[in-house]
Structure formats: structure tokens, C-alpha cells
Amino acid sequence: MVQNVKQVGPQRYRETFGRYYEDFIIGYVYEHRPGRTISETDNTWFTLLTMNTHPLHFDTEYAKATEFGKPLVCSPLTVAILVGMSVTDVSQKAIANLGWKEIRMPSPVFIGDTLYGESQVLDKR
């Protein structure tokens, strides 16, 4: 199993990141911590950066009239943060990511929500 540190000298250790191929076990779920709380600034910058200026993401009055009642965090921002959370654990040692088979967002994300991620090993190739 993956160790968090490696010895680099007498009484000297260095933090390590990532997993090697043999460290992945089909069916295992890896939790990614720490969490990340989404701010209004995060959401505003991301909507502007990606040119996704739908008012549901930043217009409070518009959002009040929707089923959500308040602005939604832009979904690609949610994905980007969760992917970033996983890097040090599951892909730090990878040469290339093979891709994602399934991404689910079962609930809306709002400003002030804290995200936690997890990855499940479905197969190895």
C-alpha cells in the first residue's frame, strides 16, 4: 500500500504523493481531502474565464425566481475542483490520465458549499 513518506536520510523523511499501478485495487474507493469551500469569487471568476455568463450563476435576483432560489456554482468549476483534489492521490505519478468513464453531480452546488471528492477504481489496464 502507498506510504505517505519516504526516508531520504538519517532521521529525515519526505512526503510522497500519488500511486503506482500496483497500488490501485479494483473496487477500492479513495477519498480526497481536505475539502474545498466554494466562494462567490471562485464562481464569478470561473464563469467569466469560461465565458459561461448565464445569469443563474451570478444574478441573485434572477436565481431567486428559479427552482434553486439562489445562484448555482458553474458545473465545470465543480468538476475542475474535484479533479484537482484527486491529483496528489491518484494521478500524481501518472504519465497521462486515461480519462473518466462517469462523472455524476447528483445535487446542485451553491456558494459556501464545501466539496469532498472520491475516486473508485473500476478497472486496470
Region roles according to the model:
Residues 2-99:
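Hot-dog-fold acyl-thioester-processing enzymes
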Residues 100-125:
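Hydrophobic beta-sheet segments that form the core/acyl-binding groove
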